[in-house]
Structures are given as structure tokens and as C-alpha cells.
């Protein structure tokens, strides 16, 4: 197993776990209390609480990254494409979040970087396959 594959498994797995945990935390406590989030962050957004953002985070970022992790672990066809798409979803999620609530946490920037790293790794895996 090479460094690109190991790095991909680690970063995609970390992102999946974080997004699933964060999304479920928002769904189970839409006030944001489990994550120490204030609903005041949502002022000016279309959301009154974290329920809908939690569902989106869980389904689109968390489960998509979980699918990418399964593809990576099982070495399924189209793994690189699934991984790249999951990274793109994460990037879109973070950009939309920044547009809606603005810059609040360093994690927003960190996860934008994570999305870029995931895209880079997916491209590297694709190159190694050729």
C-alpha cells in the first residue's frame, strides 16, 4: 500500500467520521448545543436552527465520504471519481457555509484545505492507476 492510498484512507475516513458526528449532533439537538454552536450564527440565513444543515452535513458530506472510504478500502472501480466528488461536495459545503454565516471558525478554512487535499489525492490515485 502506498502513501497516497494510506493518506486517502486516513483523510477521507477522518472527514466521514467528523461529518457524520457533526451532522447527527445537529439533528439530535438542532439548537447546536451538542457542538457548542449558537443559533445566533444563523441570523440572516434561511435557517432558524441546525436541523436542516445537520441533515445536509450528515447525508451529503458524511455519507458521501463514508461511501468514498468504502470504495477506497475495497478498491472498487471509480474509487478516484467517487473520492473527488466527495471532496467537491465538501468544498461546496464549506463555501456555502462561508457565504451564509461568514468566517467564524478556523475549521472552515481547515476543511476547505482538506477538500483540496482530497482532490489532489484523488488525482494522484488516478495517475498511479494509468
Where does each model-flagged region fall?
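Topology signature of small-to-medium multi-pass alpha-helical membrane proteins
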Residues: 2-130
